[in-house]
């Protein structure tokens, strides 16, 4: 199931690029930028792009790089800008049903993908709101400046010259959004998004059907004449997902012998012995996410291991595995940028030129997701039972 989803996602990203959908959203999103709200809008813009594409790395390395150039021209500290970029990018990586980490967490916890996304609202929404308030307040320091930057102008000009930017190109994400709201299955929903984008690409961009099919297989490959725009649009396709699929298979191969050898069971029994109550068990399961991540540097390893450790235990305790899948993301996916020696932390430092230590305090979303998830476990707010009902919050239990 997750491998099929990743294949469909790769096809959809490519089709949305050639249909002009992603270029249109990027173009008009960048037009909204204003100096006083630069950090605030940069975070939102990165969120939109990351949600639509499902890739934090792609957002950071394309739009993030452009926004960093704009920030330098405005005299806005790059660590603040990096924080806004990382928060927006990983909000999308966490909440987008197109994201490999989202698919992996749902798969390892054995829960429905879209139900998993909705259950993360309890920790993600408050963490994101705090972050947006921070960026909005910081923006008051930079009012009165003017947007400048070669990369910014080049992207706008390159997108405008290479694509027919129109509201019609926004139809594919609208169709997907409607189907998601109607609670349709993920694969047919994304399939509809691909079909609509395929038609829109032919109608609005004059795209060759054979070229679109080829791009959905091998990824988009076009020359706009502007290197940074090439980086923005040349991605997607089934081939782009092969590394991720390989990692998922490798993680599964890694987790299987751990369980077969008894290693997983030993850890599982140790956790159960320490945890005297379901609350204690879930607290330990959440804490295990960053601990395992620091050791392995990859949630492709930590999520399958956690799924092996805790999924059945959640059933036995009468709690929904959606709580577990949320823990995997709050303690795993969004923690990756904080680990300097991890792939994600090293990638961000190399791309934006800022270390995790420098942007730590400007990305509260990253660590507040963990905090709000912990509060959910302790208080019972936003915690779901195995039968689908919500746990009675602690303060109501005391009152009664």
Residue ranges and their predicted role:
Residues 1, 75-79, 105-117, 260-263, ...:
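Juxtamembrane helix-boundary/capping and inter-helix hinge elements in multi-pass membrane proteins
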Residues 1-6, 122-130, 136-250, 391-400:
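Hydrophobic transmembrane alpha-helices of multi-pass small-molecule transporters
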Residues 1-72, 224-312:
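Membrane-embedded alpha-helical segments and adjacent helix-loop junctions characteristic
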Residues 1-26, 137, 141, 166-181, ...:
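N-terminal alpha-helical transmembrane segments of multi-pass membrane transport
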Residues 3, 39-44, 82, 125, ...:
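Hydrophobic alpha-helical transmembrane segments
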Residues 11, 44-48, 69-70, 132-133, ...:
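Alpha-helical transmembrane segments of multipass membrane proteins
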Residues 36-49, 75-94, 280-293, 317-338, ...:
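Alpha-helical transmembrane segments of multi-pass membrane proteins
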Residues 94-97, 105-157, 345-400:
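Juxtamembrane and boundary regions of transmembrane helices in multi-pass small-molecule transporters
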């Amino acid at each position: 199931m997750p491998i099929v989803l990743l294949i469909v996602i790769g096809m959809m990203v490519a089709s949305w690029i050639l249909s002009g959908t992603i270029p249109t959203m990027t173009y008009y999103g960048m037009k909204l930028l204003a100096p006083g709200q630069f950090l605030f809008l940069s975070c939102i813009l990165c969120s939109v792009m990351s949600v639509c594409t499902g890739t934090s790395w792609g957002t950071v390395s394309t739009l993030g790089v452009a926004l960093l150039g704009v920030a330098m021209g405005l005299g806005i500290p790059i660590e603040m800008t990096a924080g806004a970029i990382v928060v927006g990018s990983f909000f999308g990586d966490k909440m987008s049903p197109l994201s490999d980490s989202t698919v992996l967490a749902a798969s390892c916890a054995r829960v429905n993908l879209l139900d998993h996304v909705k259950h993360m609202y309890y920790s993600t929404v408050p963490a994101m709101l705090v972050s947006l308030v921070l960026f909005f307040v910081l923006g008051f320091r930079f009012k009165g400046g003017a947007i400048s930057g070669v990369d910014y102008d080049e992207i706008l000009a390159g997108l405008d010259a290479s694509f027919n930017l129109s509201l019609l190109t926004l139809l594919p994400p609208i169709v997907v959004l409607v189907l998601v709201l109607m609670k349709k299955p993920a694969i047919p929903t994304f399939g509809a998004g691909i079909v609509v984008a395929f038609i829109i690409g032919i109608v609005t961009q004059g795209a060759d059907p054979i070229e679109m099919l080829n791009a959905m297989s091998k990824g988009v490959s076009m020359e706009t004449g502007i290197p940074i725009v090439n980086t923005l649009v040349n991605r997607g396709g089934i081939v782009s997902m092969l590394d991720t699929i390989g990692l998922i298979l490798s993680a599964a191969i890694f987790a299987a012998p751990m369980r077969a050898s008894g290693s997983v069971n030993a850890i599982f029994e140790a956790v159960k012995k320490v945890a005297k109550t379901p609350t204690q068990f879930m607290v330990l399961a959440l804490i295990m996410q960053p601990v395992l991540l620091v050791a392995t540097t990859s949630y492709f390893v930590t999520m399958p291991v956690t799924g092996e450790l805790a999924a059945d235990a959640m059933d036995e305790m009468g709690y929904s595995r959606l709580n577990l899948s949320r823990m995997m993301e709050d303690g795993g996916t969004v923690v990756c940028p904080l680990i300097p020696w991890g792939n994600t932390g090293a990638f961000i430092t190399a791309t934006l030129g800022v270390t995790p230590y420098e942007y730590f305090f400007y990305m509260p979303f990253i660590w507040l997701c963990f905090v709000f998830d912990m509060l959910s476990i302790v208080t019972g707010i936003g915690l779901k039972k195995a039968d689908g009902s919500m746990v009675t919050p602690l303060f109501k239990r005391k009152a009664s």
